[in-house]
Amino acid sequence: VLRKTIQEQESPELYTNLPGTDTLLPHYLKLLIPQYGKTILIKHLIHFQTNASYAYENLETLHQIIPLCFSAGINYIPFYYYSKLSRNDRPNLLYPFYIITEKYVLQLASDLSKGILHSDPAILQEYTKEFQNCLEHSSPLLQQSKNLDEALQLYMTSFDTIQDITSLDATPCDSDFMDNEYFFDRVKEHSPEYAPFMNAYKSFLNVINQANRNDFFTINGFQKYCEYGISSGTSSIVIPKFSPEERITSLKYFLEHFSNENHHMLNSTFSYPDSLYIELRNNHSLFLINLADKANISFIIIQESSICNAFSEFFQLLADSEYITPENQTRTLIQKYIQQLKQLTFGITP
């Protein structure tokens, strides 16, 4: 059904209520999308657990669907509703899952091992109509964008309500490396096309600086910045590469404002991709940003309570874990790189 839909339709669409925890849909999309070079629209109706004992299923769902959001060739729009049904209840349900396309409805058994295929236009019309009704009684799971300008606008939404921010990135936050004016000067120099955003971004940064912040970054990402001038997050969009002089200035600023209560360097045993940025605001808004370069950005906002609570608990555990580099070691490493960069730039020996 998937192959025929992608192969035959100019703008293929697919509607489904397959379990969010199941790997079936991501697996076949990964195989088929590259073969045909088309973009498929997928609307996915997912049930989320209300029972806290099964909340891990909600996280499993997130684990399966986020790669779909980040994938080229897939316009993936998930919706959710709450249900007390668990996977233990599925064997008692009669063909509870379905896939709807322009030409087919495929009903699937609870274990997805067998199905009933319909091609009658009347059945297709009825299923499509009822699916739309279901969407009206559900909620979008996330907001997303793959357009840089739109992503920046979304990122700065409702920033005046921010009180607490916890983030995880490969490198420290821009505002930890430099004050606002220094950042804006670098933007004007390296990427003047983003100057129109700077007034709004300045107001945003002022709020960020007043919030209670808890930032995690990796030692591998930090070393990459110090040695090659390659940052992550917003600065990597507008400042392609920091010069040795800029790195010295930013590291001095970071060392001066460093606090082990708010800044946590994760040691080399913590594996984390350079392109991913995670931010939790006020414990009820989760931002996931995958930024390969200016042309390849995936931006997601999730405001579902069980997922946000799970990330809040994760960050609390991470702060007290064996992954945290002690403050004295972090300061020593920063000072070491300042001296190395001075020697490289000005010929100053330690």
Segments predicted by a language model, with ranges:
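PLP-dependent class I/II
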Residues: T349-P350
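Hydrophobic protein-protein interaction segments
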Residues: V1-I324, Y337, K342
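Short, charged alpha-helical segments
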Residues: Q329-T332
